[in-house]
Amino acid sequence: MKHVNKILAGLITCCVILLLSGCSPRQGEKHDFSIGKGTFLLDGKPFVIKAAEIHYTRIPAEYWQHRIQMCKALGMNTICIYAFWNIHEQKPGEFDFKGQNDIAAFCRLAQKEGMYIMLRPGPYVCSEWEMGGLPWWLLKKEDIKLRTNDPYFLERTKLFMNEIGKQLADLQVTRGGNIIMVQVENEYGAYATDKAYIANIRDAVKAAGFTDVPLFQCDWSSTFQLNGLDDLVWTINFGTGANIDAQFKKLKEARPDAPLMCSEFWSGWFDHWGRKHETRDAGVMVSGIKDMLDRHISFSLYMAHGGTTFGHWGGANSPAYSAMCSSYDYDAPISEAGWATPKYYKLRELLTQYADSGQVIPDVPAAYPLIEIPAFTVGEVAPLFDNLPAPQASKEIKPMEQFDQGWGTILYRTTLPAVKEGTTLLIDEVHDWAQVFADGKLLGRLDRRRGENTVVLPALAAGTRLDILVEAMGRVNFDVAIHDRKGITDKVELISDTGRQELEDWQVYSFPVDYAFVQDKKYAAGDKLDGPAYYRTTFELDEVGDVFLDMQTWGKGMVWVNGKAMGRFWEIGPQQTLFMPGCWLKKGKNEIIILDLLGPEKAVVEGRKEPILDMLRAEAPATHREEGQTLNLKGEKPVANGALKPGNGWQEVKFGQTVKGRYFCLEALDAQDGKDNAAMAEFYLLDEDGKPLPRQHWNISYADSESTQWGNFTADKIYDLQESTYWSTKQGDKYPPQVVIDLKEEQTISGFRYLPLVLSLHNMNSGVIAYWRSSP
């Protein structure tokens, strides 16, 4: 009987193991993942992908396992990741897949925790990451055309893809790993139409060894067919609040038997310096996921956990230029520090009801311990101008890349001729934030976000030293503006009533972001300077834990702790703290170095247990309407007046004849469903040949109504190249709302293109009137 009991116990144990593992990947076991009629198939059985997007680059390697466990406890069965080219190949031909960059180790950890992997190797990844994941050194080739069949770009892409294949191809499920799908490029329809290029990237992915699992391409519902290849799976990206049926309508018409997947379901949104902290409603997010699960639609939650964009790796959007904060909290279910939020528990409750057969959702892992650090003074300082590196000489102005510098700050120095008072110094262009000095005296600051590029000079004697210190704040990560060279990109001129004079004969000093560089300075006692300087001190800890460094009294710059680049700070907010993982601290002495380009109010740092992500000190108003301001259209003759079609996708309105002017006004008469708020995703004006006009210099000069209650739904979103961000009027404001666009110069237009917003929460415009004139 005892022998029988042992056998029964063994059988029960085996059954429990099988039950717990369900359809999870176990190391060494080979599986088949394929496409069936209307569904994905895992070993021949229908499988709904419930993926959590997290990024190994935004999580300390020591915390990878915890974050993966958090995703599993959320109810997910898959982890979705990008591969970041520029983190792995920071110098041409030098690949780094070790330590924090060990992407294969990350995937194996996911497999150990019973999670599949969706791999997105780019080469372009967007992700609010520096240059969309492309390496800066590509821009050293002056005529390069990124994300095209440019021979050099394709050559370097194939080399990188082969290295990714060496790391990950053997981790496909057919070979005992956990990779079930691999993506080709990323949202390319928002960039261009070029199927030949997409085919080349597909071939590069295959040549790298990814031949066993389905390859897919993601795009927006309005653009997915522009570059869709017949042999790739098509997936759609959209976010919280989307109308699920409308998003998939065109895909179902094009491929009625294909499995459906939202490859990026945006749980929140990212933060920009100088703009309000972004949040999205948890209930609306969960409702959207439920709608998909009820229809057996697979999804990947972007982001399940955003983490932190450590160091200098944050990207930017354009137009208008706007750099990303270091926090990538994203208002995701798992917070920046790895905590389970109310949004997490709400989603977990739903996913528990849709668990896979045999799936047991584990308990939520405990968060890492928190500590506080009492305020301490950063008591050593090294003025930047007293710690200049060796210069490079250049006859003419060149961007940072031509001096073999990828990131950081760059100083351009020359001597001036005699300058009359009132002369204008024109810097074309400032990328991204500059300070101008004459013999060490600050004359002005220029911010690319505001389009600033001139300083009016006082009278200056011949031989006066001119210094232009330029900080690179992050390369644009979206659309054609990714060709974003840093420093001063063209030239510097003096403009006066006697003419224009281009300045030449520059001494150029590079200030990179490497820890070895910032450590090797002549530090001396002192705790406050007016102007750019490095600050250093040490602080003692009796215990270690996660903490948020409070940078509220500092100006603008970067922080390093124990050699780790923590990220950027800027007094304008909304982010005022930097997440400091406890795994990078140590008991006893810890070192902190701070580069502050403005100078601190107080050279003091303390560690808090809670982040500050929503303290905005920006000078710019949140909306585009001054107190009491109104728009008078009486007597104006419209250039267009009519109704827009309902439904998803771009619509085009042609005028009876071309018109010339600078200011364009769009007035929304009503909404498709008769409710009181209007919305628009994207808007283009068409030139006399019917082609879209460039929008990088556009500005909203007036907006009658803008919603900022639970997001930045301001009017400038109609030309930010993002279908997922949009202008929405404030709930309850009366019709008709109006938006006035300033093109900055007179243009001839023949019509406009308009992308309606397809959300379940907001309404598209129905009737519109358009006005066009040369003066405000």
What feature does the model see in each segment?
Residues 153-229:
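Active-site neighborhood of glycoside hydrolase catalytic domains
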Residues 23-78, 108:
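N-terminal carbohydrate-binding accessory modules
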Residues 566, 627-637, 643-776:
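Aromatic, loop-rich ligand-recognition surfaces of beta-strand-rich domains
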Residues 208, 241-335, 339, 350:
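Catalytic-core region of carbohydrate-active enzymes that cleave or remodel glycosidic bonds
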Residues 422-437, 539-562, 569-570, 592-595:
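Aromatic-lined ligand-binding clefts that engage carbohydrates, nucleic acids, or primary amines
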Residues 64-130, 202, 206-207:
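Aromatic-lined substrate-binding rim segments of carbohydrate-active enzymes
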Residues 468-474, 594-600, 667-674:
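Short beta-strand-plus-loop segments that form exposed binding edges in beta-rich domains
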Residues 92-99, 112, 123-148, 198-202, ...:
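Aromatic- and acidic-residue-enriched segments that line the glycan-binding/catalytic groove
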